[in-house]
Amino acid sequence: MTRGSVLLEKLGDRLSGLRGRLTPDAGMDKITWFRAGGEADLLFQPQDEEDLAAFLKAVPEEIPVTIVGIGSNLLVRDDGMRGFVVRLSAKGFGEAEVISPTRIRAGAAIPDKRLAAFALEAGIGGFHFFHGIPGGLGGALRMNAGANGVETSERVVEVRALDRRGELHVFSNAEMGYSYRASAASQGLIFTSAVLEGYAEDREAIRAAMDAVQHHRETVQPIREKTGGSTFKNPEGTSAWKEIDRAGCRGLMIGGAQMSPMHCNFMINTGTATGYDLEYLGETVRARVLENSGIKLEWEIKRIGAFKPDHSVDPFLGQLL
């Protein structure tokens, strides 16, 4: 029996009341935007917040539970994920509604581009930058994603989240503890929805701002490639892409993974990359930048999962274990 089948059989009675979808041995390469990585023992897609809470209460705390959102800013290693992976469904967590003239309540699984389009139709300004963020709202809330000089934290009023025990928490903007590409409140929580606030603005002005965002992306980013977005955070006082370029890493390839010639802070899967190729490439870039400029780049992409045994002894990746 596979690991997923064994776990499902072990917990069968505990999970019998769930309404969401359980998939054993789910290929993470079908979920992540990199289209690489191993299998999750069990993938759970809850129907709604109540179903997710019931799941979290049913699964013993010693069994790992990992949230992956819509898989955009994520690199999964080749031996996959132990325990459960939770992916919020668009049906239960992907809707948005206007709750006041300038406020929107949106589910964590709504794609950022769809949120921007929804705000446009509602005539609510300040959401145009979401049109330039690859991923979903849950990830944007977790990492304070931003584009075109605007960050998610500037729009957040409150965030709903469940902890590992299935208990509900509601955080104000201040309680989220936002900083550059991070939120202090994100550890161990699954964000389910948020209330966001913009301002009244003419739809044509909003549309023009969104068009400008789209034009910028198409001009400088490899948006039609298999990519997870920005690979590294910008160091203080400089840009990650500049340091990568100065270190001679534009277009650098390892296996099927490449630092995009178009934007060298975007790592792409050219078609055959494994999770190992992608992470090894990223670590090679970090080493070369450190040697060239003394700057230690920090990963912006989240890396999860287990290495295959023949990969874990690699001298570059050994420091990551």
Curated annotation (Swiss-Prot):
Q: Which HAMAP family match?
A: MurB
User: What catalytic activity does the UniProt entry give for this protein?
Assistant: UDP-N-acetyl-alpha-D-muramate + NADP(+) = UDP-N-acetyl-3-O-(1-carboxyvinyl)-alpha-D-glucosamine + NADPH + H(+)
The protein's job, in short, is: Cell wall formation.
Q: Tell me the organism.
A: Chelativorans sp. (strain BNC1)
- This protein's major location comes to cytoplasm
Q: What is this protein called?
A: UDP-N-acetylenolpyruvoylglucosamine reductase
In the record, the note on similarity to other proteins reads: Belongs to the MurB family.
Start and end residues of each FAD-binding PCMH-type domain: 36-201
Cofactors that this protein relies on:
FAD
One of this protein's GO BP terms?
A: cell wall organization
Gene name per UniProt? murB
Q: In which pathway does it act?
A: Cell wall biogenesis; peptidoglycan biosynthesis
Q: What is the lineage of its organism?
A: Bacteria, Pseudomonadati, Pseudomonadota, Alphaproteobacteria, Hyphomicrobiales
